[in-house]
């Protein structure tokens, strides 16, 4: 996990080095990519390919979106691109690894807050080296947030069904 920590921190420095990155539309009116997204993703894929030469990649800024049973890295080089180029300081770098379509480990780094989240299957999760856990709060007392996958119409109904299932329980 130390290698993942170092890799994410280096990518975070790279992300912050772009002061006014060029912004490109990905086709949808609210779906963007910046030159920083492309550079950070390239850096991450290159570094991970050297360490794991047989690995596959499911990277946001490319069309490599096939999930197999092989070790696969799922990468969002700048999660929160719109916030990033609008300087809202609410973006992070996300890497997950799955094998046989099951999570193996993941890392999320927020370079603005210098917060590193690392998790490994069977070993738990940490934030800046401190163990974190889910609470034992019952669902009817919980606060729940969710994303809506706004760029993928095929996921709209799944989001709606999920929210419809949860709402009566909170």
Regions found by a protein language model. Name each.
Residues 1-78:
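N-terminal subdomain of lithium-sensitive/metallo-dependent phosphomonoesterases centered on the IMPase/IPPase/PAP
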Residues 96-170:
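Acidic beta-strand-loop-alpha-helix segment within the catalytic core
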Residues 69-73, 93, 104:
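Short loop/turn microsegments at loop-to-beta-strand junctions
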Residues 86, 95:
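Glycine/small-residue-rich loop that forms an oxyanion/phosphate-binding "nest" at active or ligand-binding sites
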């Amino acid at each position: 996990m130390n290698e993942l920590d170092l890799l994410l921190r280096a990518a975070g420095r790279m992300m912050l080095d772009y002061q006014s990155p060029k912004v490109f539309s990905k086709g949808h009116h609210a779906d963007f990519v910046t030159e920083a997204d492309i550079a950070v993703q390239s850096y991450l894929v290159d570094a991970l390919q050297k360490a794991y030469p047989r690995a596959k990649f499911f990277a946001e800024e490319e069309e490599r979106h096939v999930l197999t049973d092989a070790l696969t890295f799922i990468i969002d080089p700048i999660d929160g691109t719109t916030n990033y180029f609008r300087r809202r300081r609410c973006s992070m770098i996300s890497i997950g690894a799955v094998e046989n379509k099951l999570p193996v480990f993941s890392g999320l780094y927020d370079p603005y807050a210098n917060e590193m989240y690392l998790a490994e299957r069977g070993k738990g999760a940490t934030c800046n080296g401190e163990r974190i856990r889910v609470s034992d709060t019952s669902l009817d007392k919980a606060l729940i947030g969710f994303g809506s996958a706004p760029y993928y119409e095929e996921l709209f109904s799944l989001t709606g069904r999920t929210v419809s299932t949860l709402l009566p329980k909170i």
